Amino acid sequence: LKKLRATTALAVVVAILGLGLGACGSSSDEGGERTTLRAVYAGFPDYLDPALSYTLEGWTALWNSYLPLLTYAHANGAAGTKIIPGLAEALPQVSDGGKTYTLILRPGLMYSDGTRVRASDFAHTIERLFRVSSSGSPFYADIVGAEHFAETKQGGIPGIETNNKTGRIVIHLNEPRGTFENELAMIFAAPLPSGTPAEDLTAHPPPATGPYVITAVKPGRSWEYERNPEWLSNNAKLLPQLPSGHVNQIDVTVVRNTSTEVNDVEQGRYDWMQNPPPTDRYAAVKDKYEGTQFRTAPQINLYYFWMNTKTTPFDDPEVRRAVNYAVNPAALERIFAGQLTATQQILPPGIPGYKKFVPYPHDMAKAKAMIAAADPSDRQVTVWTDNYGQNKEAGEYFDGVLDELGFETTLKVINSDNYFTVIGNLSTPSLDTGFANWFEDYPHPSDYFAPQLTAAGIQPTNNTNWAQFDDKALSAKVDRLSREHLGPKQLAEYTALDRAYMRQAPWVPFGSLTLSTFVSDAIDLEDLVISPIFGQDLTSFEFK
């Protein structure tokens, strides 16, 4: 998705959001009921190793194979953000002022290779994150002893206590962490057998606990799923809260031309493309197939322009507010061909604490008057964006808005593969303003404040606070709230923070991208589940 301290991975999510799943037919389907889903991705996922994957495409691919102790409900919309027990019997007991989490592993669970799932596998899994330098390891760095283990790679992590006889898992944190249940539900933390090598296993993914196991991987080209042999005979009975899936096999092929994908799905050669149709065909596909073979679903993400609050002209809040008035989110909706829903606030739709408000209704005349009154001493501005799809056009639009406001602009368009690396390096010259987006790590409002709008996010490299915004009072509130469990009081405070940050206007938020799903006429679209976190749910695909 994605994010927190893994900025490069976020760039990948954005750069290849158009990806989906795919493959050719199976002879086992011929002459009988269809049991093989043929799907298409526009590009291969970053990894097919649960310790390493950090993109929406990878998480879609892995979600129904690697089950964490906690997980999310298999449901559309807000219902899909509810944390439920996964391999654990129940949600954790939290004690010691929020610093100790106790869970019990369900007895009798098996991996797809016939190995029994043990409590100690969880400890090994977290240790493996640090051994392979996973982008997900920072989420678990607050476990007692984790930072020392990250340096030495020896001796285990003392803050994780396990008992294989009872299934008891006790996790001790250095300090309370209100997001820790969400982090236990991330695919990074899905238990793997204790002997799993500390290396990238994309070509030969590790044994699975979920209904599908990944097989026959050809990196960069294709992979397949088969039913986990231990699922229906064993794990499904122990995990009744999780769906088993309808198809017996899923064949996935990479087809990099998205227009070709559309043709193939229309003609029934493939059953599903996860990525949206290309911009020049999106409206036609939507108009023809919406409700029968095409639908959109909200995803929790935010697209915005950041402004460097440390240097002129954007060190002046009045200038930043003026720019917010000048940008027209409706124009950006058109640029994104209807795939983006306009918004003007930090918290995106779907995240807890979100309450819609419109702080800066479009008013170019007012914006020009505010700039004239502020009279910034330096009007030379470099505008940054990447070259992927509509991101480039959005940057060009923003460049034009600033030009109309009287700034002397220089537009820099960077390859999407390293865009966030470049703007995340504070030694890069002229980091004045530019495009960014953020796909949630998990549905918690802290994810939109702590890494992007506090001092903690400002780093010499891998910087995620591109506005370099640090309001001491607001940062202190974010820090305090991030240690508390979400309740009505905390949600109200996050809602208030949204407004407080937008009064300071470090960003120009303009929209949230929706996820499009296009299937063949053989698929039952009505019952398809599109998770707001993981995308299309493989267990929900069913032939008519």
Language-model regions: role of each:
Residues 40-96, 207:
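N-terminal lobe/hinge region of extracytoplasmic solute-binding protein
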Residues 226, 233, 315-405, 468-470, ...:
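Append "and occasionally in soluble cytosolic enzymes with long acidic Gly/Pro-rich linkers
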Residues 517-544:
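Long beta-strand-rich cores associated with HINT superfamily self-processing modules
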Residues 117-127, 166-172, 210-211, 244-249, ...:
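Alpha-helical secondary-structure segments
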Residues 198-203, 231-284, 408:
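Ligand-site clamp/hinge motif
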Residues 25, 92, 321, 408-420, ...:
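Extracytoplasmic/peripheral linker and loop segments enriched in polar/acidic and small residues
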Residues 74-78, 154, 176-249, 365:
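Gly/Pro-rich hinge or "lid" segments in bacterial periplasmic/extracellular proteins
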Residues 104, 116, 121-123, 131, ...:
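Surface-exposed binding/hinge segments that line
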